[in-house]
């Protein structure tokens, strides 16, 4: 059986990246929460 996680750089960025987060209002809320929490890394 193959493993379920087959990493791809492009897919990771397009689904979870900073620009994707910034492109929607809810995504911006995610970034705001992570800034407030003090996350060192905001997005993938």
UniProtKB/Swiss-Prot annotation:
GO CC, alphabetical: ribonucleoprotein complex; ribosome
Ribosomal protein listed as a keyword: yes
UniProt biased composition (Basic residues): 1-22, 30-44
Superkingdom of the source species: Bacteria
GO terms, molecular function: structural constituent of ribosome
Disordered: annotated span: 1-44
Transmembrane residue ranges: none
Gene Ontology terms describing biological process: translation
Keywords assigned by UniProt, alphabetized: Ribonucleoprotein, Ribosomal protein
Pfam families: Ribosomal_L34 (PF00468)
UniProt keyword Ribosomal protein, yes or no: yes
Family: Belongs to the bacterial ribosomal protein bL34 family.
Protein name: Large ribosomal subunit protein bL34
Species this chain originates from: Pediococcus pentosaceus (strain ATCC 25745 / CCUG 21536 / LMG 10740 / 183-1w)
Gene label: rpmH
